Amino acid sequence: MESWLGRLWLCMMLLLPLPQPCQDQELFGPSHQLPSEEGQVPEGLWGPWGRWASCSQPCGVGVQRRSRTCELHPALPLPPRPPRHPEAHRPRGQGSRPQTPRDPQSLYRPQPRGRGGPLRAPASQVGREETQEPQGAQRFRVRDPIKPGMFGYGRVPFALPLHRSRRHPHRPGQPKNSSTGEGMVPSQPPSTELASEKHGPHMQPPEPRSHSAETPRSGTAQTEVLPRTSSAPSYTGTPAPTSSFGDSRSFQGSLGPRMPPSPGSWSSPQGAERRHPPPFSPVPRSQQSRRHWRPPGPHRSPDGWLPLTRDSSPLWSIFAPSIPAPNCSGESEQMRACSQEPCPPEQPDPRALQCAAFDSQEFMGQLYQWEPFTEVQGSQRCELNCRPRGFRFYVRHTEKVQDGTLCQPGSLDICVAGRCLSPGCDGVLGSGRRPDGCGVCGGDGSTCRLVSGNLTDRGGPLGYQKILWIPAGASHLHISQLRPSSNYLALRGPGGRSIINGNWAVDPPGSYTAIGTVFQYNRPPREEGKGESLSAEGPTTQPVDVYMIFQEDNPGVFYQYVISSPPAVLESPSTKPPALQPQPEMLRGEPLLPSAPRPVRAPGTLQRQVRIPQVPPPTRVRTAMGSSAGYWKQVGHSECSASCGKGVWHPIFLCISRESGEELDEQSCAVGARPPASPEPCHGPPCPPYWEAGEWTSCSRSCGPGTQHRQLLCRQEFGGGGSSVPPERCGHLPRPNITQPCQLHLCGHWEISSPWSQCSVRCGRGQRSRQVRCVGSNGDEVDKQECASGPPPPPSREACDMGPCTTAWFYSDWSSKCSAECGTGIQRRAVVCLRSGETLQGDPEAGSTEQGCPLRSRPPDMRACSLGPCERTWRWFTGPWSECSSECGSGTQHRDIICVSKLGAEFNVTSPSNCSHLPRPPALQPCQGQACEDKWFSTLWSPCSRSCQGGMQTREVQCLSGNQTLSSRCPPHLRPSRKRPCNSQPCNQRPDDQCKDSSPHCPLVVQARLCVYPYYTTTCCRSCAHVLEQSQLEPA
């Protein structure tokens, strides 16, 4: 304890600059926080959503963010302000004593992050601090571990031998602002050792400017701190190289050396957001509720600490009590996709720009031109995977692509912070909200109600009759006639504006966009047996009226749609109803909770074992669209649109103050909560009668002139609507025509498209034809029915007379070749009987070719010819090829070859020597049979192992394929045996006297094991018998 007090006294004596030991003691000392009840975190209230930030990309798809803060409840008690140090009341400039320069200390004092905010020096010391950073601070900064990916290159994969800068990098000129780090290219691979002592002074980040009057502005230099995470190169335009200390964009706010968090950490358990401890300036309670918990600004401190305000003490408190951060359930940040304008067509997509930023980085000793590689799935879609052009591998350069990059080309999903997020129906990325069956965004379908029915009334007079009203917000609409009819469905929007089949005109089937949805109008042919229908997905933004244009009785109309009905509001019997009823524009507003009494405690004591009531600010009214000072109230309506009969008027809404009831500007009310000015019916005096004409009927003819008819009624509009009146009331008015000529299109006409053909006969009477077709008004051929109403078609066939027929013999020239090569032969020619040039051959009426022509005058059709006497010649005569010698595989074929002599038409076999002067044809040729199957092959049996009493013979068995190679595909059941018994006769026990060796070579016979052969058994009987006796004694 004495040692600790001694160090504290030393800190108070030195005053400025704050020594490092005291700084460590202050930052790492015990936390004196306001105890809470059993470690519970007080419940907080979400503040209003901030404005959407600007789009992250100047063109193309980007990301917008907005955030809100968790505010401490106004009823939360604050800790007492500790007394100021006595030195604080001493006049400025007094009490200061010169400081002895010490090696680990420096006149430059950064702004460390502590429990009480940044530590501030007296005003007398401001501006006298040096800009150079001492070695002690450098050594303190090196305590931060240098992680892979901190120097502008990807974290995974990361290997120093593979990723390094160019060996001879281009060094641009000195940048204008040295603090930004732009234009610097690392000359060597990043290492875990800072190069400040080797390469000169450090780059100092620029001091952030304060955007708040409560943030102190210091002119001191800032301690350089390595960034925590890697930052990819800039992806807009030319990639900006990064210095050896990482991206200069990481220096935002006043950064000091990293300190371990105190036991009372201000971060949430999930680490989703950081809590800001309140400053300890004695301010009024009303200001504390607004200043203690401020939304994070663009230049907030990195670890979530707020600087002291101007009215704070010039000295700092070592013991700064704190309050646990409030806890709010829900999200603190929202993101949505944005697009200011499309990017130019020549600009590459964002992934291509991000990959191209690594073209100047060496990979495995050489440079590549990188292009996006998108053939990945799952979480890899938001990684920067690039493939070098012309190579078949890819590399993950960074774990996260730039925010706003599409997960996949052509997809609506967007990458944010390395995650692929899908936009919900509310436009927020990752919200997961989808419209339910009745179009409610994020609804669960509990409020959906199906409305359906059949309209079977026969209907009224001819013309437009309203049959159905559909409210706004309806979805899944379907209206259809039960059977085909001459009636038509029509739609009118607010104010009687026509959507489909209005103004006495029938629209064609198709898609029609109105009131926030697309209506599909379908009119099937009558033969399908279905009536016309209207359908839409919805939801509709305004109500719509459904009309029927009656021309006959109503065949029945089926309708159905889904509407969202609001849930019933349950009121407590003890709660008094408010004097001002909520207006429709207050959509799902949060009800005001009754204020709870604030606990009373004795002055100077801590408030323990008391829960903070969840009471919203009493002066704030929350609605679904945010906070607003007024509400929309209907104060009247416009003039009636019709001076007589039935019309419509529109309600008028004004913005009324919730407190005073006075009229406010429209900006004081939520624009999205303004009720729609839906038209309402109004009535005037009866209108003058008028003629109402019905729809014209179809034309009486499908083409050409026809007639149309229509019905004519005298109608008059009254307050309750229009009705038919006697025609006499319209007698003073000109009567419209009830008939009119019509012509859908011109009828077709007959056209001769080809001349007459030749007569079918060459003499006598025959037929000829021509092409006749029906041509429309545009010159194209149409169906013959189009010409049926016109004159009859011209004839397409007629008879023709070619004169009387005569018969005569006609013959051709003699053939050019004689039938014999030598000697006498024959020449032939054709002779036919024709009648006026037409042959009678094959004509059943003419009979044979000689009929009609005199046979005695028939010219001859053959004659003799001779090419000279014949000479004997010799030639080889070949017979047919024989069958292939092999059934399978390769084989041979042969044929017979003989020498033949020829004299005219006589052939004789002669000696082959007579044909020796001629090339002899081959008698053999190779042939290929069918594909050979694998077969078993075996060798000859070996000699018997014994001459008597049973021996064994063996042989080799192999499976060979068709090309005589070893195979294993032979049938196992057909495999021949490899062994068989032999010499089963008994042997003589002893050799008799007659068993003698008659050859001097018997010892060699025994050694050669030739006793198994009968010859040697007889010649060398005794020697072979001795061998037999020894073999019997040995085991088999």
UniProtKB/Swiss-Prot annotation:
Transmembrane segments: none
Annotated region (Disordered), positions in chain: 73-149, 163-308
Role of this protein: Positive regulation of apoptosis. May facilitate FBN1 microfibril biogenesis.
Source taxonomy: Eukaryota, Metazoa, Chordata, Craniata, Vertebrata
Tissues with expression: Widely expressed in a range of tissues. Especially prevalent in brain, spinal cord, muscle, lung and heart.
Keywords: Apoptosis, Extracellular matrix, Glycoprotein, Repeat, Secreted, Signal
One BP annotation, GO: positive regulation of apoptotic process
Protein name: ADAMTS-like protein 4
Gene3D superfamilies for this protein: 2.60.120.830, Thrombospondin type-1 (TSP1) repeat
Feature: compositional bias, Polar residues: 215-253
InterPro entries: ADAMTS_ADAMTS-like, ADAMTS_CR_3, ADAMTS_spacer1, PLAC, TSP1_rpt, TSP1_rpt_sf
Coiled coil, from the record: none
Compartments reported by the entry: Secreted, Extracellular space, Extracellular matrix
This protein's record includes keyword Signal: yes
SUPFAM superfamilies xrefs: TSP-1 type 1 repeat
Record PANTHER family: ADAMTS A DISINTEGRIN AND METALLOPROTEASE WITH THROMBOSPONDIN MOTIFS PROTEASE (PTHR13723), ADAMTS-LIKE PROTEIN 4 (PTHR13723:SF144)
Chief location: secreted
Domain TSP type-1: 47-91, 687-748, 750-804, 805-871, 872-931, 932-988
Annotated GO MF terms: protease binding
Signal sequence extent: 1-24
Organism: Mus musculus
